[in-house]
Amino acid sequence: MNSNEKIFSVLRAPRVSEKTARLQELSNQYVFEVSNEATKADVKAAVEQLFDVKVEAVNVVNVKGKNKSFRNRAGRRGDWRKAYVRLADGQSIDVTAKA
C-alpha cells in the first residue's frame, strides 16, 4: 500500500456541523471521520502529510451506532470513530474545498 492509499484509508471524511465550525473558530480544531483501526499517530501523520500542516494534538472518540427502525424492522447503524485534530497556531485547513 503506497502512502496515498494509507492516508485515504485512515481519513474517511471531514465532519462538518455547527459544533465543528465553532471548534475551528475557537480552538483551531478540526474533526474527521477515521478508520476504526486508525491510531492517533496514524491520524496525525495522515493530516500532516495530506494538508501540509503541523498537528499539535489528536483526540479520538469511538461513536456507537444508533438503533433505528424502518417499516417495523429493527436495525442498527454501524459504529464509527472520529478524531479531533488541533493544529498549531496560525495554520488552517479548508475542509469545504471541492476535491
Swiss-Prot record:
On the tree of life, the source organism's domain of life is Bacteria
Q: Provide a GO biological process annotation.
A: translation
Q: Pfam families from the entry?
A: Ribosomal_L23 (PF00276)
What are the protein's UniProt keywords? Ribonucleoprotein, Ribosomal protein, RNA-binding, rRNA-binding
Is Zinc a UniProt keyword of this protein?
no
Q: Which PROSITE patterns match?
A: RIBOSOMAL_L23
Keyword flag Acetylation: no
**InterPro entries recorded for this chain?**
Nucleotide-bd_a/b_plait_sf (IPR012677), Ribosomal_uL23-like (IPR013025), Ribosomal_uL23/eL15/eS24_sf (IPR012678), Ribosomal_uL23_CS (IPR001014)
Q: Name one GO molecular function term.
A: rRNA binding
| Gene Ontology cellular component list | ribonucleoprotein complex; ribosome
Report the function annotation for this chain: One of the early assembly proteins it binds 23S rRNA. One of the proteins that surrounds the polypeptide exit tunnel on the outside of the ribosome. Forms the main docking site for trigger factor binding to the ribosome.
Family per similarity comment: Belongs to the universal ribosomal protein uL23 family.
Q: Subunit arrangement?
A: Part of the 50S ribosomal subunit. Contacts protein L29, and trigger factor when it is bound to the ribosome.
Which NCBIfam families would you find in this protein's record?
A: PRK05738.1-3 (NF004359), PRK05738.2-4 (NF004363), PRK05738.3-2 (NF004366)
- Show the HAMAP family listed in the entry: Ribosomal_uL23_B
The protein's name: Large ribosomal subunit protein uL23
Origin species, per record, is Stenotrophomonas maltophilia (strain K279a)
